[in-house]
């Protein structure tokens, strides 16, 4: 498959044949779904799977510690009911590209995220452009993103827009090398959903993707990532992201939110196109996100049970 690296991959994913054509990047894919189809001849996975592409034993120990800290030492607060939605604009004003990403994020906010969650929106279309020798930049977006992550905190972070293994947007509002070290949210780790191209290209033996480095970060970043390993199409990204959020906020028979692996399993039961197969869960499949679990019920007002009837005086 023309893959050359000095590193050893002990759990290799399924790699498609190299496709030589005008859309060679979108025609190739890597997936773990192939190994999870163990019953029948359909394309549905038969078990819940995820992946943590750990490069060294030391990093493996750190990931275990990071997961433990998330589950036992995270700060309690409003961040647990906060979702930060970041959406791309268009490269130019000549197409509806920017509208597409903003609308995709708005659809998540309106139709897929419950009303009792706080929704903080960082949409590139609303921020000023700075033209520098290297191109268009929007540093105010990066500043606001870091403020949401570090100061306010978010249990979920959503990115909808253009991307690569190391950057988001043509304005580089997120850069793997510089943005991740500034995310110092160790007590308020977010889970990232990235409806973008190959941000989780973990099978490049010579470089770590942004998704991996967010999970590996020792100062904060992410506790897990749902993202694609190859270039993908925005229309299908929107659909699989909406389904992922649907199950994120679904409670099981025990009244608890679903585990990440069960969420991924449910998503892959309903969606298994080539575009969908490129999406991975990087993280612990047995984990539940730290959504607020307490349910408040009013059973009495001023000592009177709410079930009591109250006589109304005639007008």
Label the predicted regions.
Residues 1-315:
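Cysteine-dependent hydrolase recognition
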């Amino acid at each position: 498959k023309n893959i050359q690296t000095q590193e050893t991959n002990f759990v290799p994913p399924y790699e498609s044949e190299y496709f030589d054509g005008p859309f060679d990047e979108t025609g190739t894919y890597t997936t773990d779904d192939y190994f999870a189809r163990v019953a029948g001849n359909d394309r549905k996975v038969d078990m819940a799977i995820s992946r943590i592409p750990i490069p060294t034993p030391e990093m493996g120990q750190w990931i275990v510690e990071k997961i433990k800290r998330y589950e036992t030492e995270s700060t309690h607060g409003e961040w647990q009911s906060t979702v930060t939605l970041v959406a791309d604009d268009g490269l130019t004003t000549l197409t509806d590209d920017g509208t597409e990403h903003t609308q995709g994020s708005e659809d998540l906010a309106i139709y897929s995220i419950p009303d009792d969650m706080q929704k903080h929106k960082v949409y590139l279309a609303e921020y000023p452009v700075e033209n520098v020798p290297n191109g268009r930049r929007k540093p105010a977006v990066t500043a606001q993103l870091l403020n949401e992550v570090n100061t306010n905190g978010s249990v979920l972070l959503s990115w909808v827009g253009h991307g690569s293994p190391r950057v988001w947007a043509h304005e580089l509002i997120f850069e793997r090398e510089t943005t991740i070290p500034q995310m110092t949210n160790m007590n308020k780790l977010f889970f990232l959903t990235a409806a973008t191209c190959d941000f989780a290209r973990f099978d490049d033996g010579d470089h770590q993707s942004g998704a991996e480095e967010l999970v590996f970060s020792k100062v904060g970043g992410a506790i897990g990532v749902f993202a694609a390993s190859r270039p993908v199409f925005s229309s299908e990204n929107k659909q699989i992201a909406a389904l992922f959020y649907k199950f994120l906020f679904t409670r099981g028979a025990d009244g608890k939110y679903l585990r990440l692996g069960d969420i991924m399993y449910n998503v892959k039961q309903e969606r298994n196109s080539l575009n969908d197969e490129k999406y991975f869960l990087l993280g612990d499949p047995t984990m539940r996100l730290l959504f607020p679990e307490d349910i408040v019920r009013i059973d009495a007002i001023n000592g009177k049970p709410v079930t009591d009837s109250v006589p109304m005086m005639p007008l």
